[in-house]
Each structure stands twice: as C-alpha cells, then as structure tokens.
A protein has these predicted regions:
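Short helix-initiation/N-cap motifs at beta->coil->alpha
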Residues: 37-41, 90-101, 221-230
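His/Asp/Glu-enriched short active-site or ligand-binding loop at hydrolase and phosphoryl-transfer sites
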Residues: 77, 202-225, 273
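Short helices/loops that flank or line small-molecule/ion binding pockets
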Residues: 100-107, 129, 228-237
Length: 304
C-alpha cells in the first residue's frame, strides 16, 4: 500500500512540476492581501500574491515548484538543479554568498531565505533594502509541508500547495505506522569524514531515521551537526552506518569504516549510502531518501 500511495504521489508531483515549470496553467490574478508567519516567527505580509520570487537555497526552489509557484521564480542560487526547469533560472550567487545587487535588479516581491544557510547579515541587508523576506528552517519532516503551504499562500497557489503537502504528510504517516513497532536499529549518520561529523536528534535527517525505526546514536547531542571522534563511535557501536556525502556518487570514505571491524555495522556489512539530494534537501524528495533508509534498516534487521 505504501508503494502504491508513494507512486501516486510522484505522479501528482510530476504533473504539478511540469505544469508549473512550463507555465501552462494560468494563475488567477488575485489582488487580495496574503500573510503567513515564517519559521522565525515573523509575519510576512504582501498586499497581493507574489508574482516575482527569488529563492536563496536549492531546496526552496524545489518547494516553490511543489507549491505550484515555480513559474513565478525569477532568480535562484547555484546548485538549484531540480526540477529541470530550475536550471534555466538566473543565478544570484550561492546560498552562503548571494549577490545583493543581482537580487534587487530582479525586482522580486518575495525572497525565500534559509535561516541556517544564508548569512543573517545578508538576509537583514535585503530586508533593509525593502524586500519582503520569508525565512525557512525545516527541522522536522512536518516542517516541509509548512514550507510548501506557506509558499503557496504567498504566491496565491494554495490549491496546488495543499494537495502536495497533504499527499506528502499522508505518506509520512503511513511510513510511521508501518515501522512504529519495529525493533530499533542503532544508526550512525555520517555527514562528513574529516572532521568526522554527524547529526543530533534535532536534525531533520534524524527525524527520517527514527521514522524508519532507527535510533540515532547521537540524538542526545546539543549541537545540530556535532563533530565526534572515532573512539566515541566505536563505544556506541551502531548497527548501521549511513552516509550521503556531497554528490550522487557513493563517497569512498564510507568504505574506510571497514578498517574498524569491531563495529557491528562493519561485521554485518551495514554500510549504506543515500543520495544527498534525497535526504539533505528539505523537500518532498525526502520521501525517496526515507524509502531508501527504511529499506536499508530492514536489511540490517534481517542480518541480525
């Protein structure tokens, strides 16, 4: 049933993304004021739905398309490569270093910013220049749905946004119900190899691991992406090690764990890879990453 619902969701998403990317569906010219509260608690108010949007993170570009507002994007940052139409957008720098002049020249009536990715000073400068800023920070799987709904509200594409968000949440809930009684698999998620970096329980990826019946061995850390040492990992002895790296290719450093043959994850060959675009971007494509992690943790259970 999960695969069936997931397939239908993908069909819906592809339909929306294609329609919005090619601008085949004309949006109603509404002039009513719109307002949402962003992830920092600030109220973002527009006199009418946005018609020119700049997104300052790749995942916000994706979420705009998922919300039915892809055709309203006039600017994006480097690595905004999904869906295909996003590759044609004017680039205003990288998410860590944006070109303020380029953004202003695009005359956006809405800028989508990323709290933990864009510098605070950069966002505040754009705000001081009179631009409307919506700040996003998805820390949980449910937050992705809020992001899509908020963008839909600000762009006047609520119907598409609601369908996408609701379908996404339905699948999340189905996965939760499927694995809620499963035996926990202690898991280590590797963000990077040097220094050795992982995630705490406050990270959205930890949320995804828990959804699949995994237990993040560093869930109790205060920092959201703590640096840890090898001795600590060995002591906590995870059953599974999951990594994604920086590209769609499996990172070579995942195999370096084979030198630590005292680890259960190594003994059982539970060294798993997930495409970073499917787990590190806070979009509906998290469902692909979740599906893969759930499959991997099921394999780890079977190898006990």
């Amino acid at each position: 049933m999960y695969k069936c619902i997931y397939f239908l969701f993908l069909v819906v998403c592809v339909t929306f993304l294609s329609a919005c990317g090619s601008n085949e569906e004309k949006q109603e010219e509404a002039g009513n004021p719109v307002s949402v509260v962003d992830f920092t608690g600030k109220t973002v108010s527009l006199s009418k739905p946005a018609k020119r949007i700049v997104a300052l993170a790749p995942h916000l570009v994706e979420n705009a398309y998922s919300a039915g507002a892809g055709h309203l994007l006039v600017g994006a940052v480097k690595f905004s490569d999904f869906p295909e139409a996003a590759k044609k957008l004017p680039i205003v720098g990288g998410y860590q270093k944006t070109n303020h002049e380029s953004i202003v020249e695009l005359k956006p009536d809405l800028v989508l910013a990323w709290e933990s990715g864009n510098s605070h000073s950069s966002v505040e400068l754009l705000r001081d220049l009179g631009l409307n800023i919506y700040v996003n920070q998805a820390n949980t799987l449910v937050d992705v749905a809020k992001s899509i709904r908020d963008i839909g509200a600000l762009a006047g594409t609520e119907e598409v946004a609601e369908k996408t968000a609701s379908s996404y949440l339905t699948i999340i809930e189905n996965v939760r119900n499927k694995y809620k009684d499963s035996e926990l698999v202690t898991s280590f998620y590797q963000v990077w190899n040097s220094p050795l970096q992982t995630i705490s329980g406050n990270h959205i990826i930890s949320n995804a691991i828990e959804l699949c019946g995994g237990k993040n061995i560093y869930a109790d850390e205060l920092a959201i992406a703590p640096i840890v040492n090898m001795e600590s990992v060995v002591t906590r002895n995870p059953e599974a090690i999951i990594a994604s790296g920086m590209s769609a290719a499996r990172p070579e450093w995942l195999d370096q764990w084979k030198d630590w043959n005292s680890l259960t994850a190594v003994k059982k060959n539970n060294l798993f890879f997930v495409n970073p675009d499917h787990i590190q971007r806070h979009t509906v494509r998290l469902l692909d990453g979740i599906n893969r992690i759930c499959t991997q943790l099921e394999l780890a259970r079977a190898r006990r």
